[in-house]
Design a protein with these regions (language model features):
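Transmembrane-helix signature of polytopic, membrane-embedded enzymes
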Residues: 27-50
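Short acidic/glycine- and proline-prone juxtamembrane loop motifs at membrane-interface regions
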Residues: 58-64
């Protein structure tokens, strides 16, 4: 993909791209959520992109994927509840799970909390919102399972299979 002597520059470019897209996607989320195009959106989008998480984990670029996709997942969830649109939620959550299932677990926990809060504000959507949320969350998880299950099988068959905690601790 890139010459060996430019790997560091390529990785730096990827980090910059992911952090920039995180800010862009968060700005888009704020614009759609509040239905306003205000100058403060740029400030908050920049603050999100340059938050402590991105600074602390820029060395592990996989962890930036879910940070980048999280605003789209939340926007997709809001569209799923309010407008019965499911595509953005399904695609962004699937990509989040595929890109890094560890951070995606935290995103999914947040989605459950955010779903309940958003649904309580929009109770008129009824039980249909719950059904859509469950179905498309499970579909996104199933889509992610295409990679997660083979990874789990491979890890189970590797040398790390027999690693366990010690029975006793001796001081």
């Amino acid at each position: 993909l890139c010459p060996q002597n430019h790997v560091i520059e390529f990785m730096t470019l990827l980090v910059i791209l992911k952090i920039s897209l995180a800010g862009l996607f968060f700005g888009y989320y704020l614009k759609e959520h509040f239905e306003k195009n205000h100058a403060a959106i740029s400030i908050f989008a920049t603050a999100y992109a340059l938050c402590g998480f991105s600074a602390a984990y820029a060395w592990d670029i996989m962890w930036l994927d879910c940070m980048m996709l999280a605003p789209l997942v939340v926007l997709g969830l809001e569209q799923l509840i309010k407008e019965k649109k499911v595509l953005l939620y399904y695609i962004s959550l699937s990509l989040c799970i595929i890109s890094n299932y560890y951070i995606a677990i935290m995103v999914c926990i947040f989605q459950v909390i955010w779903f309940v809060i958003t649904w309580l504000e929009n109770k008129e959507t009824g039980i249909g919102a719950w059904i859509r949320f469950a179905i498309y969350s499970l579909l996104a998880g199933g889509t992610g399972a295409i990679l997660i299950i083979p990874e789990a099988i491979t890890l189970g068959a590797s040398g790390s299979q027999n690693i366990s905690f010690p029975d006793t601790m001796e001081w």
